Amino acid sequence: MDLVRLTSLLPPSVMGGPTSPRPLWSNQGLPFRFQSKNRFSPVAAARASHAASPAELYWKIALPTSPMPGAIRDLINPARSASQEDTDMDEVSTDAVFFLEKDLFPGSKITLHFTRGGACAMVLLRGRADAIPFASEKLPEILTQLSVPAGSRAAEDMRTTLAECEAALLGARDQAKHCVTSLESMVEFAAASLGTRDIRAVSTEVIGTGAAETPRQEYTVEAVKPVVSVSGGNMVTCHGMPYAYAVFGCHTTTATAYAVTLAGADGTRAEALATCHGDAFPGVAEAYERVGVAAGSVPVCHIMPLGDMLWVRN
């Protein structure tokens, strides 16, 4: 359901204002400041309010039985996004740690550096996102509209993301792939791919800290349980991509997913998602080289970074 139609049915008091609902962004453009990690972050936090945001209202109505994962909560909380520490993107390493599925058990050790994925800027709703072009040929217009300096590293990241999203349309035939630019389009892609609207999203979450990352350290695996009970069932993964607002590259997968409880040496605790691939999935030959096995011979796993999401049937 489109948020414009959805919110038109709600009284003004529910929307936190006396008249029409406040958009996530002003119609006068989107101000951003450069950050070395993802290069995009809102400059100013939204006015504090106890009223639910439009994004939260949409979620509650579209997915009433599904808790909102931390990855989404962070993207509708501009105060948290704006406070994230600068980190060189070359240091992002959570999803570069690979291990064998047989080594994922209570008591095993994994050295990790939790960092956020590509999406750090605020998630938009469809009405705002659809008003902004999303095509390589429109990049100059996009940069002007979003106040991103042409020739900047941020602009180059946006160019790369647009090119990758356009290439995804010509991708592998055995996977549904799509770049989503709004919360509604993500929910609808996941629902269409899984064949039901009775779905939920899960994400890696570090417990009890608002930091954008954690130090690299050894974690002890305390518990492991499958995310879905039926092995081999389709899931949808959404990976954050660097852009001036939240953009995710989503695709179907038949990987096996586990919810993993981790305890860090410094007391940090995390509920992480591990995905294990039993075939030679594209682009990760390096993963098999690192664990010292032939590609596709045994399942190889990785921890999903903060900010990425996994969608499954309830």
From Swiss-Prot:
Keywords: Signal. The keyword Glycoprotein does not apply. Pfam families: BURP. Residues 1-16 form the signal peptide. Residues 98-314 form the BURP domain. It comes from the Eukaryota. Expressed in shoot and panicles. InterPro entries: BURP, BURP_dom. PANTHER family: BURP DOMAIN PROTEIN USPL1-LIKE, BURP DOMAIN-CONTAINING PROTEIN 7. This is BURP domain-containing protein 8. It comes from Oryza sativa subsp. japonica (Rice). The gene is BURP8.
